[in-house]
Amino acid sequence: MKLLDVCASLSLMTLAACAGTAASEQSLPCELKPAAASSSLRLAARGVQIYECRTAPDPYSPAQWTLVAPEAELFDVGGQRVGRHFAGPHWEATDGSRIVGSVKARADAPQRGAIPWLLLGTKSVGGPGHFSGVTQVLRINTVGGVAPATACSPGVPGGRVSVPYSADYVLFTD
């Protein structure tokens, strides 16, 4: 058995054993473990994933729902709103600090009907503050947010749909 298969199997067993609880860094799929960083902040996100009906690149394929952007509010462990998450993807704190991310790794969510878990590399694009030193973001514990299973027709008015989702974002610094 390959190492990746072993890591995935162990992670899934750990997740199954901890069903109903938040994932810990120890239960992550191997490909999502942040490299040499320490967790600085854990945020809960509640919002929507916005999809738009677009023509497929192949003219013989049907139109498809394509992710446009997330729109979510970010909350600390005490339930206080501390920022927002939006297109880019960006995370912006209420103090004005902001980061933009790019996907480094992804893994299917253990829960059916949930958007994937992600590891993103980030860079600061705002002023100094809570998010300015963040170098990686981990998206875990996702619920919902998946594109509609129904077909779409490009050019039809209302060709966008907002799908509710929630997730935990763990922010890391070097």
Feature-to-residue mapping (PLM):
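Polar low-complexity intrinsically disordered regions
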Residues: 1, 21-23
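Bacterial N-terminal signal peptides that target proteins for export
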Residues: 1-8
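Primary mode marks residue(s) on the alpha4-beta5-alpha5 output face of response regulator receiver
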Residues: 24-51, 57-174
